Amino acid sequence: MSNVPHELLYTKEHEWVRIDGNSAVVGITEHAQRELGDVVFVELPDVGKSFEVGEPFGTVESVKAVSEIYAPLSGEITEINNEVVDSPELVNEDPYGEGWLAKFSFTTAPSGLLSAAEYERYINDEANK
């Protein structure tokens, strides 16, 4: 069973979101990094670029696959994690900490995100299909 921190929100595309006021930190979940395998490359957008919810904003490449990362909310990139660009293995080692990907600012509260319990049910349902 994946580690699913209860203080975070989640998407069905396996991104996590930590909201703090009008900003949000985004990364991929432990489940996603485990499915991908060893991450070898992370591509993130420039600071200042805006994205709509559901729009791809970067990619994570592993030894098994290349996966797009989707914006869990509409907003502007205010910071990217250059550490993860330089050391992509951080996504595997600490997906909810040092392996975060980007910070967004937003003006409209995000909607459609899953609670930890809802995300756990979702990944269990997906595993049983």
Curated annotation (Swiss-Prot):
| Cofactor notes | Binds 1 lipoyl cofactor covalently.
The organism's place on the tree of life at top rank = Bacteria
Where is the PTM N6-lipoyllysine found along the chain?
Answer: 64
User: Where is it found, in Gene Ontology cellular component terms?
Assistant: cytosol; glycine cleavage complex
What is one GO biological process annotated to this record?
Answer: glycine decarboxylation via glycine cleavage system
Q: Which residues form the signal peptide?
A: none
**Cofactor(s) the protein needs:** (R)-lipoate
Pfam families named in the record: GCV_H (PF01597)
Report the InterPro entries cross-referenced here. 2-oxoA_DH_lipoyl-BS, Biotin_lipoyl, GCV_H, GCV_H/Fam206, GCV_H_sub, Single_hybrid_motif
Per UniProt, which keywords does this protein have? Lipoyl
Q: Which residues form the Lipoyl-binding domain?
A: 23-105
* Family matches, as Gene3D superfamilies: 2.40.50.100
Q: Which family does it belong to?
A: Belongs to the GcvH family.
Q: What does this protein do?
A: The glycine cleavage system catalyzes the degradation of glycine. The H protein shuttles the methylamine group of glycine from the P protein to the T protein.
**Quaternary organization:** The glycine cleavage system is composed of four proteins: P, T, L and H.
State the name under which the record lists this protein: Glycine cleavage system H protein
Q: Look up and give the organism this protein is from.
A: Herpetosiphon aurantiacus (strain ATCC 23779 / DSM 785 / 114-95)
Q: Which gene encodes it?
A: gcvH
